[in-house]
Amino acid sequence: MKRAVVVFSGGQDSTTCLIQALKQYDEVHCVTFDYGQRHRAEIEVAQELSVALGAKAHKLLDVGLLNELAISSLTRDNIPVPAYDSTQSNGLPSTFVPGRNILFLTLAAIYAYQVEAEAVITGVCETDFSGYPDCRDEFVKALNQAIVLGIARDIRFETPLMWLNKAETWALADYYHQLELVQQDTLTCYNGIKGNGCGECAACHLRANGLQQYQINKAEVMASLKQKTGLV
């Protein structure tokens, strides 16, 4: 039996990954992390979607320690969420949570070990993204190698969205006939607003711009998606 673990936040990207994983694996587990994020709503959305889409199990892990160490506008109410074009002096937006994906992928791999899953799937992307260093392909591959050495099991990190732009990610949801669900029922917004979100933060900007690009030229974007992924 082929099993996979999806790192699941209930947002557009991880939900699209879950939708695809359910088509590609016999058994799919979701793991969501409670790190004291600004909006608890994303945990509730993740729980609802994992059940609605048919995941085998949904594991919620308390990683509150990350909140103590990683100061970010996603973990502190007194730090405002910036507009999409705002950056800090180091080039990173205040929404960057240092070490988040290091911790999440490591814990997801441990969970995968326990449920005998062969893959950990994460929705990180290096094409249309906010510049987070722990979303880069080289980081994921390096951590994957370290994890395999550390647990002596060939657990594979899969990043199906890594080289897709946001329009192609929308096309992927549409390919599986779930575009409406992803648009209406996921929570990507940094201000915690479900669906189309606040329309002002970086996450909402990337999401809305990608959807608009897809809707303007569906055939071309879908063709590009299929060329990149090998879908038929």
From Swiss-Prot:
Binds 1 zinc ion per subunit. ATP binds at residues 8-18. It comes from Serratia proteamaculans (strain 568). Its EC number is 6.3.4.20. Keywords: ATP-binding, Ligase, Metal-binding, Nucleotide-binding, Queuosine biosynthesis, Zinc. GO terms for molecular function: ATP binding; ligase activity, forming carbon-nitrogen bonds; zinc ion binding. Catalyzes the ATP-dependent conversion of 7-carboxy-7-deazaguanine (CDG) to 7-cyano-7-deazaguanine (preQ(0)). One of its GO terms (biological process) is queuosine biosynthetic process. Signal peptide: none annotated. It holds the Pfam family QueC. It comes from the Bacteria. Pathway: Purine metabolism; 7-cyano-7-deazaguanine biosynthesis. PANTHER family: 7-CYANO-7-DEAZAGUANINE SYNTHASE. InterPro entries: QueC, Rossmann-like_a/b/a_fold. The keyword Ligase applies. It catalyses: 7-carboxy-7-deazaguanine + NH4(+) + ATP = 7-cyano-7-deazaguanine + ADP + phosphate + H2O + H(+). Zn(2+) binds at residues 189, 198, 201, 204. Its cofactor is Zn(2+). This is 7-cyano-7-deazaguanine synthase. Belongs to the QueC family. The gene is queC.
